[in-house]
């Protein structure tokens, strides 16, 4: 599979409690067929984070990869925006 044809998503890290694994919440919008209203859909993906760099609240980009475990099918590409800790 060519690297350019892999799925790439951008989302927010909602959990980093696992070792080398983050949970990313990806929100998308779909248009209702009948009424045309935009409806928000969200899905959680587990992604591989080798250096444990991503923290909760960060906006990250993940890319599809080979299965790394039972649930992990994505890997961390980059941290787009770091969370502001107050």
From Swiss-Prot:
InterPro entries: NA-bd_OB-fold, Ribosomal_uS17, Ribosomal_uS17_bact/chlr, Ribosomal_uS17_CS. PROSITE patterns: RIBOSOMAL_S17 (PS00056). Pfam families: Ribosomal_S17 (PF00366). GO terms for biological process: translation. It comes from the Bacteria. One of its GO terms (cellular component) is cytosolic small ribosomal subunit. The keyword Transmembrane does not apply. Keywords: Ribonucleoprotein, Ribosomal protein, RNA-binding, rRNA-binding. GO terms for molecular function: rRNA binding; structural constituent of ribosome. CDD domains: Ribosomal_uS17 (cd00364). PANTHER family: 40S RIBOSOMAL PROTEIN S11 FAMILY MEMBER, SMALL RIBOSOMAL SUBUNIT PROTEIN US17M. Part of the 30S ribosomal subunit. One of the primary rRNA binding proteins, it binds specifically to the 5'-end of 16S ribosomal RNA. Belongs to the universal ribosomal protein uS17 family. HAMAP family: Ribosomal_uS17_B (MF_01345_B). This is Small ribosomal subunit protein uS17. It comes from Shouchella clausii (strain KSM-K16).
């Amino acid at each position: 599979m060519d690297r350019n044809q892999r799925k790439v998503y951008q989302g927010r890290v909602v959990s980093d409690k696992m070792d080398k694994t983050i949970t990313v919440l990806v929100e998308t919008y779909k248009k209702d067929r009948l009424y045309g209203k935009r409806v928000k859909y969200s899905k959680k993906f587990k992604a591989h984070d080798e250096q444990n760099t991503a923290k909760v609240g960060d906006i990250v980009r993940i890319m599809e990869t080979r299965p790394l475990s039972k649930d992990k099918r994505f890997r961390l590409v980059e941290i787009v925006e770091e969370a502001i800790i107050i």
